[in-house]
Amino acid sequence: MSELESEYRLEYFETEGFHRKQCPVTDVYFWTRDPDRETCGEPPADDYSFIDNPGFDDQYSLSGMREEFLSFFESRDHDRIEPYPVAANRWRDDVLLTQASIYDFQPLVTSGQTPPPANPLCISQPCIRMQDIDNVGKTGRHTMAFEMMAHHAFNTREDASDEYAYTGEVYWKDETVRLCDAFFEHMGADLTEITYIEDPWVGGGNAGPAFEVLYRGAELATLVFMSMEQDESGEYEMKDGNRYSPMDTYVVDTGYGLERWAWVSQGTPTVYEAVYPDTIEFLKNDADVTHTTDEKELIQQAAMLSGYLDIDEIDNLASARADVADELDVDPSVLTDLLEPLESIYAIADHYRTLAYMFGDEIVPSNVGTGYLTRMVLRRTQRLIDDIGIDAPLDELVDMQAERLGYENRDTIRDIVRTEDRKYRETLSRGRRRVETLADEYADRNESIPVDELIELYDSHGIQPDMVTEIASDRGATVEIPDDFYSLVADRHTDDDTTETIEKRRDRLADLPETDRLYYDDQTGTEFEAVVLDIFEQDTGYDIVLDQTMFYPEGGGQPADHGTLTTEEETIEITDVKAQDGVILHQATENPGKGDFIRGQLDVERRRRLMQHHTATHIIGHAARKVLGDHVRQAGAQKGTDSARFDLTHYERINRIEAKTIESVANDIIRQNISVRQDWPDRHEAENEHGFDLYQGGIPPGQNIRTITIGDDIQACGGTHVTRTGDIGTIKILTTEPVQDGVERIVFAAGDAAIDAVQTTEDALYDAADVLDVTPEHVPETADRFFTEWKERGKTIDKLKSELAEARAQGVTADAVSIDGIDAVIKTVNGDADELRKTANAIVDEDAVAVLGSDVDGSAQFVVGVPEDIGINAGDVVGQLARKVGGGGGGPPDFAQGGGPDAASLEVALDDATSVLRSMHET
C-alpha cells in the first residue's frame, strides 16, 4: 500500500486543505478536511450517525435521487446514457450478471478496442450482486439488487493514443474527487464529515488506486482509477500479491450507490425502509409482525450499530450480534427474536426487486447460468415466505415490483413465477427422500456430504445444493458447497479437444496477417484463388494458411466448409477449417507447398445446405419468440447438413400445437421471400437501436459488427446465409425436447434436408401400414386398437398367472416339509420370474415358507418368501442358494430373489435348501 502513497497525494487535497491520517481502529489511511478527526468514518471505527439525522438538505426517493445525480453530471458536460440489462451475458461471454456500471464497457471499451458511447458519460446502472445474498436483511445496508450511479471517463496516454479507439485525457484523479466533493456539497452535506479512505483496487488482471468515500458512517461512493495491468516485473506490488505496471489506457470508474444515498437522505433505521417503504409495511402486516414503542426504539438503536455486521468479514454472526446486544445492554436472545423476523421481511422485499429485474430482462429460470441464479433467488424467497408465514401469492408480490420498475412483460413474469413455484414444490417432494437417505448415511459417519454426491444430486435429480443443505441440516448432516461447484458440473459435460499444439503456434500465427474472408463479400461464391502463406505440420496432416479464402471456419454453431485446394500438380482435400487469432487454418492430409498459388473449390452442396440451415435457425428463433413470448433467448444452436437444432430458454415444455404454429410462422417468412441483408454498423449505434437481443448467437469483437437482418429480426452473426428467405425452400420441425429444466430444443430440417426428413417419416409410416395391413391414413386408429387389445390381454395373462399361482400353492403346500414346526415348500416351478414371485406370495399367504426355483432361458432363478415372525432371512437364503449356481442375489428379510448361470445345479441347490433353512432358524 505504501508503494501507492504518491498516487493519493492529489493537488486537489492540498488546495482544499485536506489532512492525511491513519485510523487507530482500522489502520487504514484516509483524507479529511477536519484537522481534529482521528477515525476514518467506517464502522467499527464510527457508527451510523445519519439514522434519524438525515445527511442532506432534502429527503429523496429512488427516482428523485437518480435524477438529481444524472442532472448534476449532465450540467457538467457528461452525456447521460441509458442503462444496460442486468443480464451481462447479453453482451459479454465472461460474466453472467451486471455487478457494476463498468461491466457495461468491459472488455472492449476499457481495453481501447472500441470507443465508449460517450466520453465522459454518466449512468444509473441496475446491478445484481449474488455474493451479497447472505448479508441482505442482516446488515441494514446490503441489497442484492441496486443501482450504481456513476460517471466514467476513458483516457489514453499521449504517446499511445494512435493505437486506441479514443485519444488523450478527459479527466483523472483530481477532477474525479473534485466532482465527488461538488456533488456532496450540492446535496447539502457537511464536507468536514466526509472522509476519503485509501483502498487500492484489484480485479480481472487490472489494478489502480481507489478511494472509498464515507459520510456519517455510510460508504456512499467508490472512486476507482483503473490504470495498471498485471506484470511480473511491474513497479507496484498490490494487495493480491501480484506486481503491476502502468497501462496505456486509464479509466475513471466511479460508483455511487443510489439506495444508500436515498437512505442517508431519509435517515431511516435501515436501507430497506428507504427503498421499499410500502413493501415493508405490507409484509409486516401480512406476517403479523408488530412492535411496541420500546421495541421500535431498540430496533433503531441496533440499526445504528449494524455496520458491525458483514457476513464476509466476521467469523460468527451470533457473536457479532452478541456484541451489538452487549453495547445496547440487552440479552442477545431478546435482540435475535426481535430482529430475525424483520431481517426475513427485509430480505424478501429485496429478493422481490431482484427477481423483478431478472424476469423483467427476460431471464428464464433453469439449472445453468443466469437461469440458475434466478431460480436460486426465487427458491430462497419461497423458503423465507414459508418460514415467516406470508400469505400473499409470490407472483403478485414480484409483479408489484415489476410494475414499479416499468416492465411491460408482467403477464409472462407472473406465469413464470407460478410455474416455478409448482416446480419447487414438486422437486422438494421428489428429492427429499434421496437427500434424507444420504444425509443419514453421512451423519452417522460424522462426515459432510461430499462434493461428488452434490454433483450427482444436481446432475441426475436437479436438486440444487442449497436445497440439499436445507434438508440435510434437519438430519444432522453438514454440506460444504465449493465456490467452483458449477464449474465442476460443467467439467462433467465438457469434452475439451483443444490441443497444446495450437497454443504453441500462437507466436508464429501472430506474425501472419489476418486471412481475408471472401465469403463475406460474396456468400454465394464457391471458387477462389489464393497464395499459401504458411503450413503447420500436424500428427494427422497439415494446417494450411492462405492469404484469402472462401472456406468458412467452424464457429457460431456452423460446421466448417469442405472442398479442395488445387495446385499445378495435385488436388488436396480440405476436411476441416478452423480460425485462430484471425488466421484461418485449412486442414488437409497433403502439403501443397509454401508460397504456391492455389485454386480453391468448395463442396457446393454442403455449403448450400449449411447456409439454408443457418438462415433457418434465425427464422426459427424469430418464430419461437412470436409464438412463445419475448422472454425466449437462444441458449445454443448447431447447424448441420441433414438437420439443425435451436435451443431456447422457456419455462414450460413446447407442446405440439406450439411447435406447429412456430413451423407455420417460419414457413410464412420463407414464402414472403424476404431479403437477407448483411450490414456492418457501429457497435454502439446497433446496440442503441436494437438492444442486446442482437447477441442471440454470441458477442463478436470489434467496433463494427456484422448483422443479419431478416424482416424485423436482426442479429449479430458471422455465419453464411442465403440471399433471400425463399432460397431455403421449406422448414420442417422434426422434434421438440427438453435439454434441461428451462431450456427447450427444436430440431428441424430445411430445404432438401426437410424433404429427405419428410420422406423418411413417410417410409416409416408406409412400413407400419404394411405390417398392420391397412392404408397409411388408418395406421393411428389401428395402432391404438392393437395397443388397447394388447393391454387387455396383458391384464388377462396377469390374472391367469395369479390364479395359477394360487392353484399351485394349494397343491404344493400338501407337500410342505416341516422344519422345527415351520412349514416350508421347496419346489421347482416351470414358469418365468413373474410366475415364481406370484406363486411364492400365494404360498406365504398360506403361512408357509416358499423356496422356489426355475430354469429360465438356461439360467437358474430362485425366489424365497417368508411369513412374518418366522426368524428366517429370505435375502440370506437366496444368497446361499444362488452361490451354488454360480451367481448371487438378495433382498429384504421377507422376500428375495436371485440366481446364476449354472442351471444344471438347480436341483442340487434346492436339495440343500432344507439344511439352509434349518441352520438359519436355529441361529
Swiss-Prot record:
Catalytic activity annotation: tRNA(Ala) + L-alanine + ATP = L-alanyl-tRNA(Ala) + AMP + diphosphate
Origin superkingdom: Archaea
Function, as annotated: Catalyzes the attachment of alanine to tRNA(Ala) in a two-step reaction: alanine is first activated by ATP to form Ala-AMP and then transferred to the acceptor end of tRNA(Ala). Also edits incorrectly charged Ser-tRNA(Ala) and Gly-tRNA(Ala) via its editing domain.
Domain comment in the entry: Consists of three domains; the N-terminal catalytic domain, the editing domain and the C-terminal C-Ala domain. The editing domain removes incorrectly charged amino acids, while the C-Ala domain, along with tRNA(Ala), serves as a bridge to cooperatively bring together the editing and aminoacylation centers thus stimulating deacylation of misacylated tRNAs.
Designated gene of the protein: alaS
Name this polypeptide is given: Alanine--tRNA ligase
Ranges of Gly residues composition bias in the record: 885-901
Gene3D superfamilies in alphabetical order: 2.40.30.130, 3.10.310.40, 3.30.54.20, 6.10.250.550, Bira Bifunctional Protein, Domain 2, Threonyl-trna Synthetase, Chain A, domain 2
Compartments where found: Cytoplasm
Organism encoding this protein: Haloquadratum walsbyi (strain DSM 16790 / HBSQ001)
InterPro entries, per database record: aa-tRNA-synth_II/BPL/LPL, Ala-tRNA-lgiase_IIc, Ala-tRNA-ligase_IIc_anticod-bd, Ala-tRNA-synth_IIc_core, Ala-tRNA-synth_IIc_N, Ala-tRNA_lgiase_arc, Ala-tRNA_ligase, DHHA1_dom
Annotated positions binding Zn(2+): 614, 618, 717, 721
GO biological process, alphabetically ordered: alanyl-tRNA aminoacylation
Keyword Protein biosynthesis recorded: yes
Disordered: annotated segments: 884-903
Enzyme class label: ligase
PANTHER family: ALANINE--TRNA LIGASE, CYTOPLASMIC, ALANYL-TRNA SYNTHETASE
Enzyme Commission identifier(s): 6.1.1.7
Alphabetical keyword list: Aminoacyl-tRNA synthetase, ATP-binding, Cytoplasm, Ligase, Metal-binding, Nucleotide-binding, Protein biosynthesis, RNA-binding, tRNA-binding, Zinc
Cofactor note: Binds 1 zinc ion per subunit.
Pfam families hit by this protein: DHHA1, tRNA-synt_2c, tRNA_SAD
CC cofactor: Zn(2+)
Family per record: Belongs to the class-II aminoacyl-tRNA synthetase family.
Gene Ontology cellular-component terms listed: cytoplasm
Gene Ontology MF: a single term: alanine-tRNA ligase activity
